[in-house]
């Protein structure tokens, strides 16, 4: 009996020892796993820090050699930039105060787009008044000589009056990529009145988004040695945010004398899209875009 008890005690002690060894092995394995995981986490953190440093230095270097701040939103992701429903002959150039899609056949813009804030409206930079070819255009570009004796004004699309906030923006507004042959009375009359109205909207609403440009018919006339296309008409669409809601409105002006109230030129953005083949304000959610682009009422837009 005594011998039997000794054997039982020995077996129990052996089982306990095996259990302790097993538990210790498991604890050791778990500790080892935790050490490895911690090392991996620290390694990933160091790698991320290193990559961020590399990317920051690359971004700074790129900005230094090109003058371009890559932290800014690309032009094609900005709210005011339209999309074309058909293939355009174009060079798209970003300037300080506006972006232009320049038609390399017509030698006038397809469209000019910009954002205008209330602070920009009250700028004090003097008017440049010197038209020059756009240095960023590759290939042919219209010149101011093309307009001499043509009977047409050099009509701004993005107006100089909207660029008084910066000397460079003002200078670039006089690039010939930003002008079209425009009837004098329209340029100095109803078109100018709309420009002033847009500035007023910017002041009242802190910011507006503007897209404007020519509408060119198939059998268009030309002016100058470079055969610059004469538009049949001009469009402008405006987007603003007021009282928690987006609002949009379009305008179309025939390239001739008018002297009419602005509301007679008002159209829905949908109508302007049909005339131009452009799709405006595509960054907005579809339900909002579809709803606001139905409005063609000047009064409703201002309400």
What function would you assign to each model-found segment?
Residues 3-6, 22-303:
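Domain-level detector for secreted/extracellular nuclease and nuclease-toxin modules, and
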Residues 11-19:
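Bacterial N-terminal signal peptides
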């Amino acid at each position: 009996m005594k011998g039997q008890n000794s054997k039982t005690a020995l077996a129990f002690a052996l089982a306990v020892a095996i259990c302790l060894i097993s538990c210790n092995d498991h604890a050791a394995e778990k500790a080892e796993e935790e050490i490895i995981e911690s090392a991996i986490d620290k390694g990933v953190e160091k790698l991320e820090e290193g990559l961020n440093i590399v990317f920051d230095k690359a971004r700074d270097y790129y900005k230094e050699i090109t003058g371009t701040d890559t932290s800014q939103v690309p032009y094609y992701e900005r709210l005011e930039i339209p999309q074309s429903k058909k293939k355009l002959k174009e060079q798209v150039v970003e300037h300080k105060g506006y972006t232009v899609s320049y038609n390399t056949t017509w030698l006038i813009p397809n469209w000019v787009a910009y954002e205008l804030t209330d602070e920009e409206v009250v700028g004090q930079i003097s008017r440049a008044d010197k038209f020059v070819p756009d240095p960023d255009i590759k290939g042919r570009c219209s010149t101011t000589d093309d307009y001499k004796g043509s009977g047409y004004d050099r009509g701004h699309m993005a107006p100089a009056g909207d660029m008084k906030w910066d000397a460079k923006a003002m200078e670039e507004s006089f690039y010939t990529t930003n002008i079209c042959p425009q009837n004098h009375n329209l340029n100095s009359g109803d078109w100018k009145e709309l420009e002033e109205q847009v500035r007023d909207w910017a002041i009242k609403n802190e910011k507006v988004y503007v897209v404007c440009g020519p509408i060119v018919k198939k059998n268009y006339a030309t002016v100058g040695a470079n055969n610059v296309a004469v538009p049949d008409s001009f469009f402008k669409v405006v987007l603003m945010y007021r009282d928690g809601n987006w609002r949009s409105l379009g305008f179309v002006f025939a390239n001739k004398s008018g002297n009419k109230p602005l509301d007679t030129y008002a159209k829905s953005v949908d109508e302007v899209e049909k005339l131009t083949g452009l799709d405006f304000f595509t960054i907005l959610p579809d339900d909002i875009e579809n709803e606001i682009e139905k409005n063609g009422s000047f009064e409703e837009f201002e309400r």
